[in-house]
């Protein structure tokens, strides 16, 4: 049986969401958003910024910078 492997993007966003790590999201327009990742799917990210939710399309994101490092741990070892 094949195990579904999460991609790096999903691991990164899920860790930021679970640990409520504040992130800065840079958009392709140069605009900068700060907040907490509340959820995500294949095409979008929900960011909570100052109590307001924003639906951001991933194709508009250039960079996501966490406030503190996100550790990547292989849970299968």
UniProtKB/Swiss-Prot annotation:
<dbReference type="InterPro" id="IPR005001">
    <property type="entry name" value="Hfq"/>
</dbReference>
<dbReference type="GO" id="GO:0045974">
    <property type="term" value="P:regulation of translation, ncRNA-mediated"/>
</dbReference>
<dbReference type="GO" id="GO:0005829">
    <property type="term" value="C:cytosol"/>
</dbReference>
<dbReference type="GO" id="GO:0003723">
    <property type="term" value="F:RNA binding"/>
</dbReference>
<dbReference type="GO" id="GO:0006355">
    <property type="term" value="P:regulation of DNA-templated transcription"/>
</dbReference>
<comment type="function">
    <text>RNA chaperone that binds small regulatory RNA (sRNAs) and mRNAs to facilitate mRNA translational regulation in response to envelope stress, environmental stress and changes in metabolite concentrations. Also binds with high specificity to tRNAs.</text>
</comment>
<keyword id="KW-0346">Stress response</keyword>
<dbReference type="InterPro" id="IPR047575">
    <property type="entry name" value="Sm"/>
</dbReference>
<dbReference type="InterPro" id="IPR010920">
    <property type="entry name" value="LSM_dom_sf"/>
</dbReference>
<keyword id="KW-0694">RNA-binding</keyword>
<comment type="subunit">
    <text>Homohexamer.</text>
</comment>
<feature type="domain" description="Sm">
    <location>
        <begin position="10"/>
        <end position="70"/>
    </location>
</feature>
<dbReference type="Pfam" id="PF17209">
    <property type="entry name" value="Hfq"/>
</dbReference>
<protein>
    <recommendedName>
        <fullName>RNA-binding protein Hfq</fullName>
    </recommendedName>
</protein>
<dbReference type="GO" id="GO:0043487">
    <property type="term" value="P:regulation of RNA stability"/>
</dbReference>
<comment type="similarity">
    <text>Belongs to the Hfq family.</text>
</comment>
